[in-house]
Amino acid sequence: FINSKRKNNLDNNAGRHDFGGELIKKLNYKFSKISNFHQNEPKPIFFENDLIFFDKKGSLIRFNESKKKVWISNNYTKTEKKSKPFLYLAKNQNILIVADSISKFYALNIINGDLIWTKNNSSSFNSEIKIYKDKFFVTDSQNTLHCFSIKDGREIWSHKTENTLIKSEKKLSIIINNNVIYFNNSIGDVTALDVQKGNLIWQLPTLRNIIYAESLSLKSSDLVLDKKIIYFSNNKNEFYALEANSGILRWKTKINSVIRPKIIGNAIITITQNGFLIILDKVSGNIIRITDIFDKFKEKKRVQIYPVGFVVGAKKIYLTTTNGRLLIIDIKTGKNEKIMKIDGDKISKPFINKNKLFIIKDKAIIRFN
């Protein structure tokens, strides 16, 4: 199953990367410390050989390959900077789209960092951003999906789903396929809408059998689409496969995971909250293999360690954890071959770009060959 090719980001199906680096530490891209880093899921933007990220005051920084700053752009007032906005980023050719945790969203010219337009929303944002043709999509903390124009930030349509008083710390997910947009909300609903007008196609409340109080603690993985089937899991011991056309349940199995699964060929790879690597058959949902990859952690510390995210390389799986470690796992055996200390606290999931691996800390991005 390791011969599958990587797919585009509209379906969140990264598959397998042709990466076999030796993980030699090469560069640190440094920025001022992000205080609420551990509560969020940061993602950099790669543009040609450069990297774009932000600091604690919301300043966007474009670094070149030698870690020199090409430009710095901050579009916040003194008061807004004190709120320490967390930024969600996406790019469309030479335009950088930003939505943040203090209800602002705006667009920059990636080449020079100049502001193109800026807008305000009634609620803060808490999802990945997806760009499709001349539009971009993002979900706010009120569980409302917005469709905006890339050109001027004008709202084209929005769709509100059921909301709760308690806001989820887990970033919400969006996927797009065949002019249909799918997204989850903080209480486990998965909704399918027409991309052009926002008309409802179907909606599935996945937590219908769980009492309301329990739904407030829900954390779900990203949605992943593969061949008309949507896959995702949550911390309520549920892994779902839904038919994208109808929302009908294809299968469900008991797996406790909140990180994005990878689909490679006929296999699904995921990692549970307590550190087990699981490979499933994507057609039936049957478990093919389970391997303990937290076995090298001491028992007392293990219960406090959780997976953050992983990528699949040519021969290895690279997994980061909440205690700042990078685990290198052999694909064939599922065994944990090596643990590298990156930091003493939570780090981001790994990112691979142009055969280099990147990991974000609260005040730097580390690049490995």
State where each predicted segment sits.
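Extracytoplasmic beta-rich repeat domains
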Residues: 25-45, 69-90, 115-133, 155-178, ...
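Short loop/turn segments that connect beta-strands within beta-propeller blades
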Residues: 64-68, 109-113, 149-153, 194-198, ...
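Blade/loop signatures of beta-propeller domains
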Residues: 1-29
